[in-house]
Design a protein with these regions (language model features):
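Core catalytic alpha/beta fold that binds nucleotide/phospho-ligands
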Residues: 1-223
Length: 223
């Protein structure tokens, strides 16, 4: 029997997104490989490159943290499912939440960086290292609007400008069709360029250890 969906802790109108390094996520006290579903573990076991495996694991864990913050469920009850409409099979394709059919989820990973997003309606996230330069231009011209390619070519750093347009396009692609807003920013601390496309306004949060509880000590009456 499926447990009833719990009420969402937020206002239900704002998407949540987070970006982190793979190391930050794997060091989080509430996130670990044991949270993954059996089908996720099978896919993880098939990845031969250790760094890529860690990135995939961290992205899936970060998505659980986003879902937990959005829905009020703990991370161990925030597992996404995946389904591919093209081959009519589960285990891959666009992620979704069983208990919240109106909520969109998305994840991304690239070279030690991970991103995740959850929100009402469609949502997509993409993260890339700030030093990456997409190309070649002949390929980008088939993916990006011509106006974006021209604008990037005229920028002081065309490569950096193209990267920003690229992450926006990837986030939109993951979110799907519709009237989408795009929030794009550079996380200088992690040297990452991030974009979130969503039907609702989006906000971000920082991944890190939960703050230790504040201990109130009794006041010394002699002082």
């Amino acid at each position: 029997m499926t447990a009833p969906a719990r009420p969402m802790t937020g206002d239900g109108r704002t998407a949540l997104a987070a970006v982190a390094t793979t190391g930050e996520v794997l060091a989080h006290p509430r996130l670990h490989e044991g949270l993954l579903e059996p089908w996720e573990l099978r896919r993880l076991a098939a990845i031969r490159m250790p760094r890529r495996r860690d990135d995939v694991l961290a992205a899936r864990l970060l998505l659980r943290l986003c879902v937990a913050r959005f829905t009020g469920r703990p991370p161990e009850e925030s597992a996404p499912a995946q389904y591919c409409a093209d081959c009519d099979r589960p285990g891959h394709g666009r992620p979704y939440l069983h208990d919240h059919p109106g909520v969109g989820v998305s994840l991304s990973h690239a070279d030690g960086l991970v991103g995740a997003a959850v929100g009402p309606g469609a949502v997509g996230v993409d993260v890339e290292p700030a030093t990456r330069r997409p190309g070649p231009l002949s390929v980008l011209a088939r993916v990006l609007p011509e106006s974006a390619v021209r604008e990037a070519a005229d920028a002081p750093d065309p490569g950096a400008a193209l990267l920003r347009f690229w992450v926006r396009a990837e986030a939109r692609l993951k979110a799907g069709d519709g009237d989408l807003r795009v929030l794009e920013w550079t996380d200088r601390h992690r040297s990452a360029v991030v974009a979130v496309a969503s039907t609702a306004p989006a906000t971000t949060f920082t991944v890190g250890p939960e703050p230790a509880p504040r201990i109130r000590r009794p006041r010394d009456p002699t002082r």
